[in-house]
């Protein structure tokens, strides 16, 4: 689903210190700060460019190797938050076609202690969460990692836990081409002039996602995190294209772009690979390659899903697609076709793709009869059954009729054999006002919340 861009601000302040604080940079090429970590923390080398203070008993000074950066790979930086409150940037080489992809042994550790619970997994045609194998319900709140008020994030998870919603999908990307004002949340900067990309791990960067993961652990909610958007909201493919050239359809095969994308995947996966709060990683949100052969997305998905599994074999991986290009039950309408470069059944057969996803927006797709959606759900359930993998009804919504037609789709999802559903999207009042709102939003505590969420949960619990 396309999302409305929103910006959250945070003033980053701090006092200088002779020691590097928790999770701060403490070494690496060109680094001139302190290599001594605070008491109870030690300096661990993650690569030649970056060492970080991690939990441990002693402080050590990392060694620096002299391995040169491949000349054919774009520069990718990690912006680390230090105790002075000032971001320090250090360049690291991203993987390129001529450079072996990094293995999981070289990935950085999770930045937060992991909570209780177990890794979610596929169990036949269903999902197993913390020892329970059954049908699950959840929602989308793409905007949550961009909130700067911790209390707002805590409130969202309080409400999800109370409602029994076990799965939450949030954006794991926020790409920009111009450095925003200090304190503006972004995750990665693609600089066209410098030909570099910078990953922001500061207080207005991935530390916001850190808090979301920690809150999910606390409340027993599992997160789905995609790495890039096909739409321009929050950067998308175009943010890469503006910096490195090509087009949105060439994004999947552009070597420089893919090396930057893989470097970002490694940075995020390495932070949370030990967290039980991660339900699954997704290659992207609604990947499309308009007019392309289906081999393009299939080949890309095969390569990237295997790469993610090499970094983190414990969590599930999904494509994050809309479910287009389905032959089973096809009525030859636009969603069943392959014009957007997807072949649902072929992609589902990729060994490192653990489950299928489907989205449903009749109005946006030019479908006049909302009842059409019931067949869409049923036919995907059949395809997943044939593949022996679960199906996640990952996004669905309509402009109005939340309490009529959407409830019918939910009942179809329950009865057809899909494994879970996530309504688009969750909304609530925040300290700054309403959360990002579109025509599909279901706000907590409203009449629509009761019918579209609470009534649905009653049916889920009976299932």
Curated annotation (Swiss-Prot):
Positions of the UniProt region annotated as Ser-rich linker: 75-118
GO BP annotations, alphabetical order: mannan catabolic process
Location in the cell: Secreted
GO cellular component, one term: extracellular region
PROSITE patterns in the record: CBM1_1 (PS00562), CBM1_2 (PS51164)
Region Catalytic, residue ranges: 119-463
Domain comment, as recorded: Has a modular structure: a carbohydrate-binding module (CBM) at the N-terminus, a linker rich in serines, and a C-terminal endo-1,4-mannanase catalytic module. The genes for catalytic modules and CBMs seem to have evolved separately and have been linked by gene fusion.
UniProt name for this protein: Probable mannan endo-1,4-beta-mannosidase F
Gene designation per UniProt: manF
């Amino acid at each position: 689903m396309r999302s409305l861009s929103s910006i959250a601000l945070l003033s980053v302040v701090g006092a200088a210190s002779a020691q590097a604080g928790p999770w701060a940079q403490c070494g690496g090429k060109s680094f001139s700060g302190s290599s001594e970590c605070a008491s109870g923390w030690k300096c661990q080398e993650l690569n030649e460019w970056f060492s970080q203070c991690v939990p441990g008993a002693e402080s050590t000074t990392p060694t620096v190797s002299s391995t040169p950066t491949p000349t054919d790979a774009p520069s990718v930086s990690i912006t680390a938050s230090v105790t002075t409150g000032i971001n320090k940037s250090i360049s690291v080489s991203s993987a390129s076609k001529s450079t072996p992809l990094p293995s999981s042994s070289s990935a950085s550790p999770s930045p937060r202690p992991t909570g209780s619970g177990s890794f979610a997994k596929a169990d036949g045609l269903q999902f197993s969460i913390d020892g329970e194998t059954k049908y699950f319900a959840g929602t989308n709140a793409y905007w949550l990692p961009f909130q700067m008020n911790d209390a707002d994030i805590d409130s969202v998870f309080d409400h999800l836990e109370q409602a029994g919603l076990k799965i939450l999908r949030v954006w794991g990307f926020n790409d920009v081409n111009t450095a925003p004002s200090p304190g503006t949340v972004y995750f990665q900067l693609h600089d066209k002039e410098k030909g570099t990309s910078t990953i922001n791990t500061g207080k207005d960067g991935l530390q916001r996602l850190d808090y979301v993961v920690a809150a999910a652990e606390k409340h027993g909610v599992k997160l789905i995190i995609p790495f890039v958007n096909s739409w321009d909201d929050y950067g998308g493919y175009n943010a890469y294209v503006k910096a490195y050239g090509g087009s949105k359809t060439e994004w999947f095969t552009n070597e420089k772009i893919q090396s930057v994308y893989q470097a970002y995947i490694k940075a995020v996966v390495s932070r949370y690979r030990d967290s039980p709060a991660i339900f699954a990683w997704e290659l992207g949100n609604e990947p499309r390659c308009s007019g392309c052969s289906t081999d393009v997305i299939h080949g890309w998905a095969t390569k990237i899903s295997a790469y993610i599994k090499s970094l983190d074999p414990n969590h599930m991986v999904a494509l994050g697609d809309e479910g287009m290009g389905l032959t089973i039950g096809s009525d030859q309408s636009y969603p069943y076709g392959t014009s957007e470069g997807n072949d649902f059944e072929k992609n589902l057969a990729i060994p490192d793709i653990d489950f299928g996803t489907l989205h449903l927006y009749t109005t946006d797709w030019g479908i006049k009869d909302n009842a059409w959606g019931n067949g869409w759900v049923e036919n995907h359930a059949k395809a997943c059954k044939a593949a022996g993998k679960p199906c996640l009804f990952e996004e669905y919504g309509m402009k109005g009729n939340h309490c009529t037609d959407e409830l019918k789709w939910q009942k179809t999802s329950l009865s057809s054999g899909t494994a879970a559903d996530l309504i688009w999207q969750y909304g609530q009042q925040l300290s700054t006002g309403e959360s990002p709102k579109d025509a599909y939003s279901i706000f907590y505590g409203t009449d629509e919340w009761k019918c579209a969420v609470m009534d649905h949960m009653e049916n889920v619990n009976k299932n």
